[in-house]
Amino acid sequence: MKQVYIIKKNNPKLLLFFAGWAADETPFKQYCPQGMDYMICYDYRTLDFDTSILEQYRQVNVVAWSMGVWAAPIAVPKEKLLLIAFNGTITPIGDTDGIPEKTFRDTLSGLTPASLQKFMRRMCKDSNAYKAFLAITPRRDFNEIKEELELIEKKYTQMRGITIDENGNYIYSNDDEMDAYVNDKYQYIDYDYAFIGVNDRIFPLENMKLNFDYMFDDDKLIVADCAHYDEPMFRFLLQDMWSMPIDDFLSHLRELDT
């Protein structure tokens, strides 16, 4: 995992952003959370995370997006954290609470530079949003991105006790192994808030709702009118909300919730 400082001014607080698959810092480096250092994490070919950088901060606030919603609770310790999820699940592959298995397998097996561009187009709400995204699109090597998706699948299936046959089909473990996985899943660090988009075309809305059902009441799950990649929502989550008085923050949550 890469950890890149965007702002490092020895502030007492850190905003730690876990980006999605195929991302880097390019689309997110324009944001400036008030009174905080700001670090972006990406490239989940490994989930190794240098926790020593957290020791200098009084408070660490975590925003996780897309595949980062799965990676963040694995990487970070439980202390001093406020965790916010956006358009992702802690079960990255799953027919009921993640990206449907066939969709994930088809994306991986058919991945080309052209299909990657189609994926990025699907992340965006409309053609104008996609055009704006192209100006700040990640600058990573395609082969590295493909390897990242392969290793995400490998890591997740190993964690869950799933084997993959020669045709790419998932073979699930026996009941004892599944029970062990479920128990481990529920020991994840719980998110404090989750924002999910009605126009998300990567993670199905109902799957995200199911994923967060066990964590908290409905007032902590915000269903917003946004796409998978949504620049106004990122501006709120990575910048504006951190300078809001609490009453304004809660009022804005009510406005966002559809």
Where do the PLM segments sit?
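Conserved HGGG/HGGXW glycine-rich cap/lid loop of the alpha/beta-hydrolase fold
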Residues: 2-48
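Conserved alpha/beta-hydrolase "acid-adjacent" motif
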Residues: 201-207
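Conserved alpha/beta-hydrolase catalytic His-Asp/Glu region
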Residues: 114-156
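Short beta-strand/loop motif that positions the catalytic acidic residue
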Residues: 194-196
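Gly/Ala-rich beta-loop-alpha elbow adjacent to hydrolase catalytic centers
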Residues: 63-68, 72
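Flexible "cap/lid" loop of the alpha/beta hydrolase fold
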Residues: 80-110, 138
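Catalytic histidine-centered segment of alpha/beta-hydrolase-like enzymes
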Residues: 223-241
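Acidic beta-to-alpha connecting loop that harbors the catalytic carboxylate
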Residues: 198-201, 225-227
